[in-house]
Swiss-Prot record:
Nematode polyprotein allergens (NPAs) are synthesized as large polypeptides that are subsequently proteolytically cleaved to active polypeptide units. It comes from the Eukaryota. This is Polyprotein ABA-1. One of its GO terms (molecular function) is retinol binding. Pseudocoelomic fluid.
Length: 1365
């Protein structure tokens, strides 16, 4: 449909363009006209928009091709492509396959869409040639072979190019200017254009061949000889770029070289000359309009269309006169094309009384034999119109009895006068035959009773008349006789189809296509089918199986039917009313609806089979047996009408029959019943909130989460009471699921004193043995919560001495009351344990002096208590003895780690994870503070930071007081340092170097430091000295000193490297770059960057801002910026790897090495760099340069996975508001992860059909990505594996294997980006299908058997998860 195309292959159109196409369709415009308009819009595009549209249209063309030639041949083409076939081989193969198509409808599609698809597939191949064609650009041509143009015309062409007009449009405009010339101006322009064509020919065939052709011309060779040699030379060209030149410039050059002769020969076919001959029947006003159109540069096709429009408006004698004149023109053109001798031969054949078919065959044969290109163009230009003119008179005479006008007095006489007038107006307004037919059927469908019967008879008469015309009177009489003999409807229908299938005449086949569907409908609406169906109409049903509806609801349904709402919408409304019922009203409605379903079943399978099914049910057969028999009976139905009943009513009846049983079985676990049993501990307000959530359609998961939230808020006796109630509910569910006998067995095991592990294993075994789908759903729904409830009491009893409340009086007693209150409030507000711990450590870090010491002792006491609990008292005592014996810190630490590593109890391992990091910090703080005091901020302000201003010192002290991290303080100091210049900078550098030397001495020892100093004083090179320092630092094993290296090393390296590197790096500063590889920035952007640098913004922020400006560019501006940035990257590469290596890489690139080879060599060269400064360059500039060098290719490859394109494909299920929000997030620079999270959030909010639809769209996107990542062949292999019935595990393993084999970095990034979300999407459908009967009271009949097979693996995984917890 048009809507489908606009959302998929034409989604790149603007809303205005889409509306225009819809209007064209509604106005009855032909498919060709609409396609012409689409290609017009496409031709206006350029750059990325063009690429995006091309990709969309290519997908459409591929789908079309698959539909025409079949999947098997598409796979054959794909295999050819992957085997390395070039575009010519593929094109030839496609042409061959299309030429073998025999189906008329498919051949019509080839004719309709082939040219456009060829154009689309040719569009992208032009891109990479644009750089090499610079000597044939518009700009250079204006001073050479286009110099004859006026300045005004040149300016117009340049403006057109700037506005993104296509090459075709520019060429058309140039030829338009050329066609307007006369006399000497024309001669001059012709010479210049011929010169341009000669230059292009020389470039395409080579100078030697061009010289050979020139010599041939100068020797006096005939035009035909010369033309043949040129064609031969062009045909021998194999270079793709040059072949494109031939395609681009060939037609225009042929025109230029042929213009003088052809103008003399063609003058009698110009518009002007024709107005006095075969167009003399036009009015003066119409002639003036045509001349104006030609003057305005309208195409020949548009002029022809206008003439035929004027012709179609004529009637009677005026029409006859025009037909004769036009036939005369066609005869004249035919004589010119095939020659006078052949034309005379055809005329004699016509005069001899030859049939239309014979004559047509001979004309086609004569035209097919024409080889002259100019004459072949005549055939292309005038052939279609002449065929129409020659066909119009006969067909009008033959078809008049099927025109709208004649039909209004025969088989449409039942229409009212108003309806007849409306149809005539529609025809006058140019509405299509389809529109008129649809309107007639609409009027017919509105009829009832006798009026309907009368109309049916009239329409049947019309259909019989058409049938007689199509199959012939003899065959029609034979069919009538068969019908009268009492043959069944199926026999008659088969014979009619056979007769229609045997028709070969194209005009008659068109009748079948035009009237067949409507006649089938009319013959199907007969008395029999109406009599059979009347008891299933809405009206009759309102008094039978829909009598439970209120009068208001009945009226609403009747109104919907009157308004033309679809059957599906009516059914949905009825089920909506049904779903709103409760209690007895629900029971009553269920019985009535079941009665209706039984009545339909009886009609569909027959009374005998229905009785058999009833007996089976009454005999006590299981639901599964009964269901299998019903499915078998329905599957055996062959009557199309009855099969339609199954499709129409089957889903609803399945739902109705599933609802009662599931409600009866589950009532004791409903929310309502639970509020008085295992949820009786909730407050009334909480119960009301839950009931409201259920009423508002909240999911079961949301209700469960809310209950657990209320539970988690409880404390003390209230918590105990709730725990007992919930445990009671869990026991009740367990009993229902595993059976009373097994539940009693488990209870006895528990009472006998079995361990928690034994009991858990037995429960898991019992649950694993459950096979009933409903009960397995209970396990999935209630299992996690019940495990939580049963685990909570023990863990709370064991952990109570580590709760926040108890700790406030022991190892957290050093906190102020205000701080304690804040922590209790955070816990009450549901803050995570990590947040509470972070807050405590924040309070601790703020302490100083004795307060700090006191807190440290208390916290250490808490850590010792936890350690004792985790490793046991015996091991804790052993560790204490080791400490007291004077063991070193390293020995003690190793023993503690060993003891912790030996812990196997999961709860205790959780303690290690929860409290370990904080305790390590507490135990490390006291010693390190004592040893590090001479490197504190306070002491440093008077030594190596004395160069700071007082204001800066105060700022640093304030930051420390506010709890800022050491990294932030260091960054601030380096910021102040970077702002300095001149002597101030030198002074600060010396002070900081002094600090670094002091730290180095502390870390490596005085002896090693003195050794390094001597090495430096001896004149050792920077590299030698650096190597020795690295060696000394590497030899450090003390953890505290290694921390010093980590903390101060980077800054000291910077300070020591700053003077030299500043001298060496000046050519890569922001300031110098603004005049080189950043010169493409606007002055405003440059000023902004300088301001950012002045404000102390980091290099990363400046780089991000530059890339932001770059990403905003488009077209030529983007190209220019890319070139400048690439130049900067090349300069940096040369500096990093050296000029020799850079030259080697450039030679490799120029030799035509692949992108992969070049990339590998660059990576190898960078990997070999050992100089730290240069390695820093790689770290600083590498990512951006990779982006710049990768931007064109990756943008072209990835555009089909952009947010914008996805909104019309696999994200089309989002609301407009949601789409706008995502686009805004992208515009605001939100990360891909954030966008993905938002999309999944929207997805998670969906339910029912909306969820299913979204899942299918997202799965489609995932399949598209998978195909891109692993390749079409591998994707097809995976699809075949899935279709063969492979298990989920097998399929998953194969997908993982395929993904693991991917080595391309870009594709691996796709896996990283989209893999997690796609795994989630593919997981959601199965789980929803498994739970379907537990959520809305129906059984997933179709998936029942498959889900049993899958669940065994699922529960194994589920048990593994439970075992982990």
């Amino acid at each position: 449909t048009m809507e489908h195309y606009l959302k998929t292959y034409l989604s790149w159109l603007t809303e205005e363009q889409k509306e225009k196409l819809k209007e064209m369709k509604e106005a009855g415009k032909t498919k060709a006209e609409i396609q012409h308009e689409v290609m017009h819009y496409y031709d206006q595009l350029h750059g990325e928009e063009k690429q995006q549209a091309t990709e969309k249209l290519k997908v459409g063309c591929k789908m079309l091709l698959k539909g025409i030639i079949g999947e098997e041949k598409v796979v054959e083409l794909r295999n050819m492509k992957e085997a390395g076939a070039d575009i010519q081989e593929l094109q030839q193969k496609v042409e061959k396959m299309l030429s073998e198509v025999t189906d008329e409808k498919q051949k019509e599609k080839v004719h309709e869409y082939g040219p456009a698809c060829k154009k689309i597939f040719g569009a992208t191949t032009l891109q990479h040639h644009r750089r090499r064609r610079h000597h044939f650009t518009l700009e250079s041509s204006l001073d050479t072979h286009l110099k004859w143009l006026s300045q005004e015309q040149k300016d117009e062409l340049l403006k057109m190019k700037k506005d993104g007009k296509t090459k075709k449009e520019l060429e058309a405009k140039i030829l338009h200017y050329y066609d307007e010339l006369e006399g000497d101006a024309k001669k001059e322009a012709t010479e210049h254009l011929k010169g341009g064509c000669g230059e292009i020919l020389k470039h395409v065939v080579g100078e030697e061949k061009a010289a050979e052709l020139k010599n041939l011309k100068d020797s006096g060779a005939s035009k035909e000889e010369l033309k043949a040699k040129v064609e031969e030379a062009l045909h021998a060209v194999t270079d793709e770029e040059k072949k494109q030149y031939i395609a681009d410039f060939g037609p225009a050059c042929k025109k230029i070289y042929g213009v003088h002769t052809s103008r003399r020969r063609r003058h009698h076919f110009t518009l002007e000359s024709s107005l006095d001959t075969h167009l003399k029947w036009l009015s003066q006003e119409q002639k003036d309009e045509l001349l104006k159109m030609k003057k305005d540069g309208k195409a020949k096709k548009e002029l022809e269309a206008k003439i035929l429009h004027y012709y179609d408006e004529l009637e009677g004698d005026a029409k006859k006169e025009a037909t004769e004149h036009l036939k005369g023109g066609c005869a004249e053109i035919l004589k010119h094309v095939v020659g006078e001798e052949k034309a005379a031969e055809l005329k004699n054949l016509k005069d001899s009384g030859a049939s239309k078919e014979e004559l047509k065959a001979k004309v086609e044969e004569a035209l097919h034999a024409v080889t002259d290109e100019e004459k072949k163009q005549y055939i292309a230009d005038f052939g279609p119109a002449c065929k129409k003119i020659y066909g119009v008179h006969t067909s009008r005479r033959r078809r008049h009895h099927f025109t709208l006008e004649s039909s209004l007095d025969t088989h449409l006489k039942w229409l009212s006068q108003e309806q007849k007038d409306e149809l005539l107006k529609m025809k006058k307004d140019g509405k299509t035959k389809k529109d008129l037919q649809a309107k007639i059927l609409h009027y017919y469908d509105e009829l009832e009773g006798d009026a309907k019967k009368e109309a049916t008879e009239h329409l049947k008469d019309g259909c019989r008349e058409i049938l007689k015309h199509v199959v012939g009177e003899e065959k029609e009489a034979e069919l009538k006789k068969l019908k009268d003999s009492g043959a069944s409807k199926e026999e008659v229908k088969a014979k009619v189809e056979e007769a229609l299938h045997a028709v070969t005449d194209e005009e008659k086949k068109q009748y079948i296509a035009d009237f067949g569907p409507a006649c089938k409908k009319i013959f199907g609406a007969a008395h029999t089918s109406r009599r059979r169906r009347h008891h299933f109409t809405l009206e009759s049903s309102l008094d039978t199986h829909l009598k439970w509806l209120s009068q208001e609801q009945k009226d609403e349904l009747l109104k919907m039917k009157k308004d033309g709402k679809a059957k599906k919408e009516l059914e949905a409304k009825i089920l909506h009313y049904y779903d709103e019922l409760e209690g007895d009203a629900k029971k009553e409605a269920t019985e009535h609806l079941k009665g209706g379903c039984r009545e339909i079943l009886k009609h569909v399978v027959g009374e005998e089979k229905a009785a058999e099914l009833k007996n089976l049910k009454d005999s006590g057969a299981s639901k599964e047996e009964l269901k299998a028999k019903v499915e078998e009976a329905l599957h055996a139905v062959t009557d199309e009408e009855k099969k339609q009943y199954i499709a129409d009513f089957g889903p609803a009846c399945k739902k109705i029959y599933g609802v009662h049983t599931s409600r009866r079985r589950r009532h004791h676990f409903t929310l309502e019943s639970s509020l008085d049993t295992h949820l009786k501990w909730l407050s009334q307000e909480q119960k009301d909130e839950l009931l409201k959530m259920k009423k508002d359609g909240k999911a079961k998961k949301e209700l469960e989460a809310k209950i657990l939230h209320y539970y988690d808020e409880l404390e003390g006796d209230a918590k105990k009471e709730a725990t007992e109630h919930l445990k009671g509910g869990c026991r009740e569910i367990l009993k229902h699921v595993v059976g009373e006998e097994k539940a009693a067995e488990l209870k006895n095991l528990k009472d006998s004193g079995a361990s928690k592990e034994e009991l858990k294993a037995k429960v898991e075994e019992a649950l694993h043995a459950v096979t009933d789908e409903e009960k397995k759903q209970y396990i999935a729904d209630f299992g996690p919560a019940c495990k939580k409830i049963y685990g909570v009491h023990t863990s709370r009893r064991r952990r109570h001495h580590f709760t926040l409340e108890s700790s406030l009086d022991t190892h957290l007693k050093w906190l102020s009351q205000e701080q304690k209150d804040e922590l209790l409030k955070m816990k009450k507000d549901g803050k995570a344990k990590k947040e509470l711990e972070a807050k405590i450590l924040h309070y601790y870090d703020e302490l100083e002096g004795d307060a700090k010491k006191e807190a440290t002792e208390h916290l250490k006491g808490g850590c010792r208590e936890i350690l004792k609990h985790v490793v046991g008292e015996e091991k804790a005592a052993e560790l204490k003895n080791l400490k007291d014996s004077g063991a070193s810190k390293e020995e003690l630490k190793a023993k503690v780690e060993e003891a912790l590593h030996a812990v196997t109890d999961e709860e205790k391992k959780q303690y290690i994870a929860d409290f370990g990091p904080a305790c390590k910090k507490i135990y490390g703080v006291h010693t390190s503070r004592r040893r590090r005091h001479h490197f504190t901020l306070e002491s440093s302000l008077d030594t190596h930071l004395k160069w700071l201003s007082q204001e800066q010192k105060d700022e640093l002290l304030k930051m420390k007081k506010d709890g800022k991290a050491k990294k932030e303080l260091e960054a601030k100091i380096l910021h102040y340092y970077d702002e300095l210049e001149g002597d101030a900078k030198k002074e600060a550098t010396e002070h900081l170097k002094g600090g670094c030397r002091e730290i180095l001495k502390h870390v490596v020892g005085e002896e090693k430091a003195a050794e390094l100093k001597n090495l430096k004083d001896s004149g050792a090179s920077k590299e030698e000295l650096k190597a020795k320092v690295e060696e000394a630092l590497h030899a450090v094993t003390d953890e505290e000193k290694k921390q010093y290296i980590a903390d101060f090393g980077p800054a000291c390296k910077k300070i020591y490297g700053v003077h030299t590197s500043r001298r060496r790096r000046h050519h890569f500063t922001l300031e110098s770059s603004l005049d080189t590889h950043l010169k493409w920035l606007s002055q405003e952007q440059k000023d902004e960057l300088l301001k950012m640098k002045k404000d102390g913004k980091a290099k990363k922020e400046l780089e991000a801002k530059i890339l932001h400006y770059y990403d905003e560019l488009e077209g030529d501006a983007k190209k220019e910026a890319t070139e400048h940035l690439k130049g900067g990257c090349r300069e940096i590469l040369k500096h990093v790897v050296g000029e020799e290596k850079a030259a080697e890489l450039k030679n490799l690139k120029d030799s035509g090495a692949s992108k992969e080879e070049l990339k590998a060599k660059v990576e190898e060269a960078l990997h070999a760099v050992t100089d730290e400064e240069k390695k820093q360059y790689i770290a600083d500039f590498g990512p951006a340069c990779k982006k710049i060098y990768g931007v064109h290719t990756s943008r072209r490859r990835r555009h089909h996975f952009t947010l914008e394109s996805s909104l019309d494909t696999h994200l089309k299920w989002l609301s407009q508001e949601q789409k706008d929000e995502l686009l805004k997030m992208k515009k605001d620079g939100k990360a891909k992860k954030e966008l993905e999270a938002k999309i999944l959030h929207y997805y998670d909010e969906l339910e029912g059909d909306a969820k299913k639809e979204a899942t299918e769209h997202l799965k489609g996107g995932c399949r598209e990505i998978l195909k891109h990542v692993v390749g079409e062949e591998k994707a097809a292999e995976l699809k075949n594996l899935k279709d063969s019935g492979a298990s989920k595990e097998e399929l998953k393993a194969k997908v993982e294997e395929a993904l693991h084999a991917v080595t391309d970095e870009e594709k691996k990034q796709y896996i990283a980006d989209f893999g997690p979300a796609c795994k989630k999407i593919y997981g959601v459908h199965t789980s929803r299908r498994r739970r379907y009967h537990a959520e809305d009271g129906t059984d997933d009949i179709d998936g029942l058997a498959q889900s049993r097979q899958r669940r065994s693996g699922f529960f194994e995984k589920l048990i593994d998860v439970f075992a982990f917890f």
